[in-house]
């Protein structure tokens, strides 16, 4: 029995590090360097796709131009549905940027072999698997819908907090704090959980990589990008909506 236990102790076990970061020091601040690296990679991919699609613009689109125009049409339709015909156009770039960054970030975690690249500490991963990234995106969304409401209604925007009765003011304030929290933690939790589950299974059964689970992860990653962009547009639409007006189409 002791011989069996000693043999087991020498067998290599699968390991997966969580919470290990590659820090960059900026003065007295420490920055998660690996997240900046992967974020720059994602941004570069999006810019490259936009550049290639605009190299030789045709009246009848094909190839990359056709793909990017389809993506733009999808984003425009999503923004219009949530904000409304009257006010949606200025917000298409913002919602589109959110959707594309989150979508490409999520997929990069599943398709790009980040763990092959060794760092002095920590490991590369999808930007959206870091809580700092998702909180930043959620705070940008909060700033956007406050800006939308105040730019259209002035300080009268906050009068909506007292509707339908003044008793609702504390609840409306709490709601404003919970919106970015729910956005950030939903995205962070889903992407991190997906990476951990796939990572553990790949380590445990390296000869039979769980491809079906990876495909499911790609689908769920796309859904998370859609949910975030849809909710962001919906919050902006609520801020722009006139008090007492009927729901926009």
Curated annotation (Swiss-Prot):
Annotated Gene Ontology cellular component terms: plasma membrane-derived thylakoid membrane; proton-transporting ATP synthase complex
Subcellular location: Cellular thylakoid membrane
One Pfam family recorded for the sequence: ATP-synt_A
Keywords tagged on the record: ATP synthesis, CF(0), Hydrogen ion transport, Ion transport, Membrane, Thylakoid, Transmembrane, Transmembrane helix, Transport
Membrane topology of this protein: Multi-pass membrane protein
Record-level Gene Ontology MF annotations: proton-transporting ATP synthase activity, rotational mechanism
Transmembrane regions: 35-55, 92-112, 131-151, 187-209, 221-241
Subunit structure: F-type ATPases have 2 components, CF(1) - the catalytic core - and CF(0) - the membrane proton channel. CF(1) has five subunits: alpha(3), beta(3), gamma(1), delta(1), epsilon(1). CF(0) has four main subunits: a, b, b' and c.
Function comment: Key component of the proton channel; it plays a direct role in the translocation of protons across the membrane.
UniProt-recorded name of the protein: ATP synthase subunit a
């Amino acid at each position: 029995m002791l011989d069996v236990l000693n043999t087991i102790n020498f067998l290599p076990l699968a390991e997966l590090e969580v919470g290990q970061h590659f820090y960059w020091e900026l003065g007295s601040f420490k920055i998660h360097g690996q997240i900046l690296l992967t974020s720059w990679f994602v941004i570069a991919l999006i810019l490259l796709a936009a550049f290639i699609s605009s190299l030789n613009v045709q009246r009848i689109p094909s190839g990359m131009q056709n793909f990017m125009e389809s993506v733009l049409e999808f984003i425009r339709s999503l923004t219009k549905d949530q904000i409304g015909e009257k006010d949606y156009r200025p917000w298409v770039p913002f919602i589109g940027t959110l959707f594309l960054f989150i979508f490409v970030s999520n997929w990069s975690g599943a398709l790009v072999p980040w763990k092959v690249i060794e760092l002095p500490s920590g490991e590369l991963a999808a930007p959206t698997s870091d809580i700092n990234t998702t909180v930043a995106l959620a705070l940008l969304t909060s700033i956007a819908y406050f800006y939308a409401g105040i730019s259209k209604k002035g300080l009268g925007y906050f009068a909506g907090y007292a509707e339908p009765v003044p008793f609702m003011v504390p609840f409306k304030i709490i709601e404003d704090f919970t919106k970015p929290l729910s956005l950030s933690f939903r995205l962070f939790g889903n992407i991190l959980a997906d990476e951990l589950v796939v990572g553990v299974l790949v380590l445990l059964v390296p000869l039979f990589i769980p491809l079906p689970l990876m495909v499911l992860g790609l689908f769920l990653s796309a859904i998370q990008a859609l949910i975030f962009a849809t909710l962001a547009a919906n919050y902006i639409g609520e801020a722009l909506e006139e008090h007492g007006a009927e729901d926009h189409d």
